[in-house]
Amino acid sequence: MLKEIVIQGKSISENSSPYIIAEMSANHNGSIERAFETIKSAASCGIDAIKMQTYTADTMTINCDKDDFIIKGGLWNDFKLYDLYKWAETPYSWH
């Protein structure tokens, strides 16, 4: 078993403090400026890394009005899957 790894100068082992990875998800609300502010805020809280899901609506689903593509129940009730993914997408151009 691997005893230790080092990521950007931080040792990760059985005896080190946890390496904390935060999930940004769609909390940027489509704004790259908000994404940067989220990353800065996470860093100021001691987060070691940010996990981002990079996708576009077209890579997740099709733009379809059939019932199988409409969310039923919950916060996103009656949202079309495509529209939800479009709202939450993290574009590849942000890299």
Residue ranges and their predicted role:
Residues 23, 42:
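Conserved, mostly hydrophobic/aromatic
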Residues 25-27:
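Glycine-rich phosphate/pyrophosphate-binding beta-alpha loops
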